[in-house]
Amino acid sequence: MLDILHKVGIKSSSPNDVYKALTTVDGLSNWWTDDTQGENQVGGKLEFRFGGRGGFDMKVLELEPAERVRWQVVDGPEEWIDTKISFDLRQEGDWTLVYFKHEGWKEAVDFMHHCSTKWGVFLLSLKSLVEAGKGAPYPNEIKIDSWE
């Protein structure tokens, strides 16, 4: 199995601001995709849609306030099914460090390369949301290739 890993530092005196952006529909829709719905509680389902390109449904596995968010993909592209996504938060001074992992990819297909870059793009959108009050969720994110 293969994993996508990223680390992003967000200027924030408290990881609570980042945690809120990861655990509320309003927060998620302001950095990942503006079409976000669902119940963000353990056992709940979150639905993320990307216009005509489809989307993903996530089962919420873990919510540890100001520390960790973990989901399992239950619907979406075949390559994503049963993969897990986690955000681990650590505070260092005035910075909240986000350790991101999208784990369980079966093989390094072209779509995995695309998703790795897009995760980086959206994590920078999360950073912008927390630091400046405005993210760049889909459909306003940075475009990276001909798929978009």
Predicted regions and their residues:
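Charge-dense, helix-prone N-terminal extensions
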Residues: 1-3, 16, 46, 55-56, ...
